[in-house]
Amino acid sequence: RNGLLLTGHMMEEPTLKSQPAALGEAMRSYRSFQLPGIDMLCDWREYTTAKQAQSAAHQFGCPGVMSELYGVTNWDFDFRGHKLAGDWQAALGVTLRVPHLTWVSMEGEAKRDYPASIGYQSPWYTEYPMVEDHFARLNTVLTRGKAQVRLGVIHPVESYWLHWGPSE
């Protein structure tokens, strides 16, 4: 009604082993979102997390995939790291990046959170448009046209669930 899309991410999305214990199955859970999302922490290079969300977005007619990224990357995570992580995820189908994080205040434990805030508290904040302008252009290209998918992969989570159950 107001033009807002519901988005978010699930817990323990990456593997067949992690999904049954945490949420049952990521693919079915993505149906609840108008923009399926993932949470890719630690600057890891995961294949399945982004591809599951992209597949769900295609199947359910969603306009793209959201990712919360850069979390748990530490204070020495530089612009090269930001670009590499964003490019990796774009190659796997992520079209909307939600950077983790910007502080309201550096008071208390916030000053020890990581990565460094993407906000005015960081000395490089005025230079950050170099990174964001790149992704603005890239995501404009990625959201034009329609995907032509000619390959199907069976997601075997039901078989995993039946064999191992929720507690094993």
Task: State where each predicted segment sits.
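Carbohydrate-binding surfaces of carbohydrate-active enzymes
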Residues: 1-168
